[in-house]
Amino acid sequence: MVARSRMGGPWSRAQRVARAFRDGGHEVTLAWGDDGNCADPIAPTLEIPVPSPLGLPEAIARHTFPLASRLGLMGRKPVRSFEEVLWLTGALDERYTRAAVEVLRAHMRASRPDVVYSEFSLAAVIAARAEGIPCVGSGSQPTTAAYASHPRKSAGIRRLLRERGMPAPASSLTVLEGMRRRFIPSCPTLEPRVGERAVYCGFLDEPPALTGRPRDCALVYLGAGSVPVGVAVRTGRELAEALGCDVYVAGVSEAVQAVGDHEVTCAPRFDVADLLPRARVFVHHGGQNSMMDALSYAVP
């Protein structure tokens, strides 16, 4: 999944899956795009188109959508399903999907991979189906049509599928659920209803050995652009005052603020493997990666 909005989860999961395939002795190609999220690939790459938010012209979307994300404007728009997320990012735009599918199909014809792994990429699922290549991928309960959907946003996808003689379900989320296997990097307690052909795989990385380091800080991550920056920073300041410790706020612009004898350090990204072993608490937006990272380090 590539998008103009800042979202580290899809790329980090794709990197982890690619690393596991590579460590198992397989050749891997990572499909990526110039979206500001894909960086430092651990395998050879294939560049694919990046969708324009809401299908806007590229010149407009490249600047306006990241700005809206940084200002937290995206967090002010109610989003009621993952299908709406795909629509907002432009992933349901018919022209984009056609272009991405053709790039992917051309590569598949040339390389004939044994399997395609889709990280919430409709284009990858459609291309693999068209080329007769098995397709598996990531999944979660909130991304199923049964959880929430908005089929009106997927008219272009249905038209594209019908042209290719493929089943065209009402919701594009059903297309993602149609993969041969959907791997859920979570657990039944957190996501009990994930649909058919789903396999819970828990942590994507080996859980770290807990070393008993002093718990001397707190970590805040409320999504990149999911809420206004001021809300995230204010949360960090309140935590520093309440807990009497340093706080790190991820997903916002770089800054350092003093709160009494402690500091609130803000940055777009932090190395969670360095901070979570020290964290007394992790305040986050409920994302799958954040939930599992907190569990793996035994952080409330």
Q: Which stretches of residues belong to each language-model region?
A:
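Short, polar loop motifs at secondary-structure junctions
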Residues: W32-C38, E119-A123, P185-E191, V249-Q257
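Active-site proximal beta-strand in glycosyltransferases
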Residues: V115, R129-A145
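Donor-nucleotide binding loops and adjacent catalytic segments primarily
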Residues: A18, A198-V281
